[in-house]
Structure formats: C-alpha cells, structure tokens
Design a protein with these regions (language model features):
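Low-complexity, rRNA-contacting terminal tracts
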Residues: 1-50, 72-187
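An N-terminal amphipathic alpha-helical segment
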Residues: 49-66
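Residues forming anionic-ligand binding surfaces in small-molecule and nucleic-acid pockets
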Residues: 69
Length: 187
C-alpha cells in the first residue's frame, strides 16, 4: 500500500499536481472526507469508523515572521531575523486545528503536501464523546480527562519531538521532566 501512495509522479496534469492546486484554493483549515495517505493515517491510529475526523491544515514555511520596528535602533537590537518559534510547524498546525474543533481531540498528524510557500498537514482527530470511540478498547484511553487538550501541552508526537523527548541518555539530561523545569537549558 505504501509503494502506491509514495510513488512520486513527475510532470503536469497528474493527481499530485492537481491536488496542490486544490489545496491552494481551499481554506487554511479544512475538513476532508478521508485521508489522502491512507497507509500513513492507519499507522498513526486512524480507523475508517465513526468518531474519527481528518482535517487538512495549511501553514506557511519559514521561521517567525517578526515585524520590523519603525523606530531607530542598532540592527542587532531589531529582533527581526534568525528568530524561530522553538516548536515545529507541524505542532503549530495541530494547535490551530484543535482551536478550530474544540470538541475533538488531536490524535496525530502527517505531512501530505508542500509547495514553495506552505506545508500541508492532515490531522487525525477523535470525537471522545462518541459512543463508538468510548466502546473501542484501543482508543478509549483518549476519553479520560487527563488527555484533554493534549496537543496544547505538547503530548502529540510532533510536540514531543519539538520538546526534545525523542532523545535519550547522554546529552539529554536537561530535557526531562521538561525544558521549563531545567530553565530552558535543554534541547
């Protein structure tokens, strides 16, 4: 299944090319009927059953777009260039989708497309109040209260990666229990 989806088409008027045109015309956060990359969605926990929702998010590429101050100062004190968010753009996309759909919970996400200006992610969301989700033993952990707004606390896969929690052992002493607990010395 993966080989079918990951086969990169070259040239114009292909499905991949037309998909990009459709994404650019659409809204920045848009619900989709089914996942574009089915193999990736299933790996991350998606099932074709009630209670699962897939949302596509568009987010601009690059670091923080800081506004240049109008008043005079030394160029190094402008605070414009070389500033980054400290979190990856996939995590930012997940947070924006969570804000748009407050009754759903973010399960995971994956990159689906990129052009010169934007990244496009598909975010898998779960309706934790749906009876099908509550009765499924593989996913009903998300219905418990400690998993509320998990993405805003950096508990999704991209959030944990941005917080440096994929690294273990020597060199990662300051990443746990959190970056804040170690006064930002980690990562």
């Amino acid at each position: 299944m993966k080989d079918t989806f990951e086969k990169h088409e070259t040239g114009y008027q292909t499905n991949h090319w037309n998909r990009g045109i459709e994404y650019r015309k659409g809204k920045s956060i848009e619900r989709v009927e089914k996942p574009t990359k089915l193999h990736r969605a299933r790996t991350l926990g998606y099932k074709a059953k009630q209670g699962y929702v897939v949302v596509r998010a568009r987010i601009r590429k690059g670091g923080m777009h800081k506004v240049r101050p109008k008043r005079g100062r030394k160029p190094r004190a402008m605070g414009v260039s070389k500033y980054t968010t400290g979190k990856n753009l996939q995590w930012v996309a997940e947070e924006r989708v969570q804000r748009k759909y407050p009754n759903l919970e973010v399960l995971n996400s994956y990159k689906v497309y990129a052009d010169g200006r934007n990244w496009y992610y598909e975010v898998i969301m779960v309706d934790k109040n749906h009876p099908v989700i509550k009765s499924d033993p593989k996913i009903n952990w998300i219905c418990e209260p400690q998993h509320t707004r998990r993405v805003t606390r950096g508990l999704s896969a991209s959030g944990k990666k941005a917080r440096g929690l994929n690294k273990k052992g020597w060199g990662s002493e300051k990443t746990r229990p959190s970056l804040g607990a170690n006064k930002g010395r980690g990562k």
